[in-house]
Amino acid sequence: MQSENYCGLLALRLLVSYHLKIHSQLDGINGNAFSIKIIVTHLFKRITRCISFVMCAIYYLQLYIKAWSSMKRYRKSLPALGVLILLGTTWTPVHTYAQIGFPDDKPAGGGGGDLTRQLATNVSTGIITGILNGTVPLQTALPILGFTNSTNQTCVCVPSGRCATTTVPTDGSGMIDVRIVTSQTSSPISPTPNIVTPPTCAAGLDRCCYPGPFQCGLQYPAVAAAKAPAAGQAYYGEYPWQAVLLGPGDIYVGSGALIDPLNVITAAHRISEYVSGARALRVRLGEWDASAASEPIPALEYTVSKFFVHPSYNAANLQNDIAMLRLSSAVPLGATPTITTACLPATSFVGTTCWVSGWGKNDFVSGSYQAIQKKVDVAVRSPADCQTALRTTRLGSTFVLDATSFVCAGGEAGKDACTGDGGSPLVCSLGGRYFVVGLVAWGIGCGTSNIPGVYVNVASYVPWITSTVSLA
């Protein structure tokens, strides 16, 4: 502030005498004297600002020269510091996109069907520069945009002051995370590892490093700047793998789960009308409050370049109700704690309490879509138990549950996914990491006692997912 006052005084001393002289001359002019006086006054204000800018530049240049001469041992760092200051004052990475609407009705608490959202339109190369090319069981890993360095560490950006509370499993669990690149597949990311020193994270985030390759299914602490969630709501960034699917006009279509930098899995029945390509579909990551104009960390949005629907998908009974969406460009994993991947399951989670999240309706009959991401805990049930429960509904006593296609969870009154949640991930925790065990598929009503919800059994489709991600 003192330097700004100094610059202003310098400019003022240069102009005040000329300014007063011209004003005294204008006072003697008849007719349009007042208009001319306003114009000249406005002109002098602009000239004053320009001179102030020049004087400030000279002032800071003098400081820089003094620092250069007095800080000999730090001279190598000063040019870089100047570049960082310049970038810090000019880079504007976000843009506001309008019109995110929910179909049929208005979101609860959203204030209307058309919502606004702040998105990151680009990712600074100063934030994401490293490429990690590791391996996981079952296949070769797709290079991950993230931070890595010469000590074979992975560094991610977490909320400031929370690195110590970010626990990373060391037992190797969850290494089934799908990341593929083969000699037959051209990847949009160079397959050659580029080992660099991790740069700094964006404002409000700290760089947190752990040994080894990038790991899926990690849940990071809440961002301090985010507002506290209400009962039944997820905290901001709690489910960083969840994707929002948007149709033309930013209409909410459904949800999905990010499983690697280029692929999102979802329920096939949610995107069947988009597969032909006649209607554009987009994927938004890092979403939480769809009614807010901005959030602490901007969301990222991608167009879907390719659709892969399971070849045995049956629209009548929703068997094999799974699809994969190929994104137009790779997601920069590690840049923020609000976007990461979920792990793919390799074991049964029957009897485990898991979580489903989304923006679907809060009631089957008269519910509204939710502006803020909701969550609910549901227990995974055995196929036999699920079939028995569903036979008590209108499905009848002859209903046979396809245990390959489906997994069931829930049955506690008032706890369930509902209309609009299609494709939302059901995730279970194992060893401190989250696995996408199911995708919301169908149900009989919502939240009825002893009637579980039915989800796509993701474990059955891991081989299909693994082979599909390798397709060009």
From Swiss-Prot:
Q: The Peptidase S1 domain covers which part of the protein?
A: 223-470
- Record-annotated disulphide pairs: C354-C428, C386-C408, C418-C446
Q: Which Pfam families match?
A: CLIP_1 (PF18322), Trypsin (PF00089)
> GO CC annotations?
membrane
The way it spans or sits in the membrane comes to:
Multi-pass membrane protein
Glycan-bearing residues? N122, N133, N149, N152
Chief location bin: membrane
Q: What keywords are annotated for this sequence in UniProt?
A: Disulfide bond, Glycoprotein, Membrane, Transmembrane, Transmembrane helix
Tissue-wise, where is it found?
A: Expressed at highest levels in head and salivary gland. Expressed in ovary and carcass. Minimal expression in midgut.
Q: Which residues cross the membrane?
A: 51-71, 78-98
Q: Which molecular-function annotation in GO is an example for this chain?
A: serine-type endopeptidase activity
* Traits of the deletion mutant: Salivary gland extracts from mosquitoes with RNAi-mediated knockdown fail to induce migration of NIH 3T3 mouse embryonic fibroblasts. (Microbial infection) Salivary gland extracts from mosquitoes with RNAi-mediated knockdown enhance dengue virus type 2 infectivity in the host cells to a lesser degree.
Transcription regulation in keyword set = no
Instruction: Tell me where in or outside the cell this protein is found.
Output: Membrane
Q: Please give the biological process terms from Gene Ontology that the record holds.
A: proteolysis
The protein's superkingdom reads Eukaryota
The family line of this record is: Belongs to the peptidase S1 family. CLIP subfamily.
Q: What does this protein do?
A: Probable inactive serine protease. Induces migration of cultured mouse embryonic fibroblasts.
The name this protein goes by in its record: Inactive CLIP domain-containing serine protease A3
Which species expresses this protein natively?
Aedes aegypti (Yellowfever mosquito)
